[in-house]
């Protein structure tokens, strides 16, 4: 009795997995629009319904298996089939909802175009301009974020160079003090240090000005 039940379960399970694969391939074709969406969607829906029916049969069969280890194994397989069928069913429903929305939008657009060059065409032009404006805002935002990141990287580079320069200057001054060079040489080094500092700040200010002008330009 147990072997017969397991054998029947194996056949039902194999059939369910085969139909699941066919339904999954059908949904992938729907996403690519390789076939007629209406007929293919109906075929996929029938496959999912058939798998759900087979899953109910499996649920009744595995409960009659006396050996607990085998019963638990087939329970998990039955649950797996049910979960896959539910996932495909949700995917199909999402596709059908998106497809219906696209068809509705296309119909509304056609209705607006059908009104000629009057109010409908004007409304359609407004929609197109708003869509272009949103795309322009997204592009400007992305460019601004890229420019900001570049500015931050430049400022970080300046800060890193400043720290390295200060460390090198301290070491140089220590060496100069050790060998006893003249005060004129030390003043020359300090003057060069001030010039480098001004160059650094000028670069930072120029970067901020460029960012400000870019923000004003994108608005």
Curated annotation (Swiss-Prot):
Domain of life: Eukaryota
CDD domains: SNARE_GS27
Cytoplasmic side: 2-197
Topological domain ranges for the Vesicular compartment: 216-219
GO biological process: protein transport; regulation of innate immune response; regulation of protein secretion; vesicle-mediated transport
S-S pairs: none
Keyword Phosphoprotein: no
Keywords: Acetylation, Golgi apparatus, Membrane, Protein transport, Transmembrane, Transmembrane helix, Transport
Bilayer topology annotation: Single-pass type IV membrane protein
Modification N-acetylalanine occurs at: 2
GO molecular-function terms, A-Z: SNAP receptor activity
Main location per the UniProt record: Golgi
Membrane-spanning ranges: 198-215
PANTHER family linked to this entry: GOLGI SNAP RECEPTOR COMPLEX MEMBER 2, VESICLE TRANSPORT V-SNARE PROTEIN VTI1-RELATED
Family: Belongs to the GOSR2 family.
Annotated function: Involved in transport of proteins from the cis/medial-Golgi to the trans-Golgi network.
Name of the protein in its database record: Membrin-12
Gene: MEMB12
């Amino acid at each position: 009795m147990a072997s017969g039940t397991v054998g029947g379960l194996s056949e039902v399970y194999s059939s369910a997995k085969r139909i699941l694969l066919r339904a999954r391939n059908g949904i992938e074709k729907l996403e690519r629009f390789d076939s007629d969406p209406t007929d293919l969607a109906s075929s996929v829906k029938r496959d999912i319904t058939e798998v759900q029916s087979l899953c109910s049969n499996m649920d009744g069969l595995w409960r009659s298996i006396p050996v607990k280890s085998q019963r638990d194994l087939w329970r998990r397989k039955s649950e797996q089939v049910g979960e896959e069928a539910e996932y495909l069913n949700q995917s199909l429903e999402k596709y059908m909802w998106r497809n219906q929305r696209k068809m509705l939008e296309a119909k509304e657009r056609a209705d607006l175009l059908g009104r000629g060059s009057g109010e409908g065409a004007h409304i359609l032009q407004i929609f197109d301009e708003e869509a272009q404006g949103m795309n322009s805002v997204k592009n400007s935002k992305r460019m601004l974020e890229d420019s900001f990141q570049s500015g931050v990287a430049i400022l970080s580079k300046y800060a890193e160079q400043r720290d390295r320069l200060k460390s090198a200057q301290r070491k140089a001054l220590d060496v100069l003090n050790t060998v006893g060079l003249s005060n004129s040489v030390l003043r020359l080094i300090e003057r060069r240090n001030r010039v480098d500092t001004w160059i650094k700040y000028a670069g930072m200010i120029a970067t901020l000005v460029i960012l400000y002008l870019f923000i004003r330009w994108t608005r």
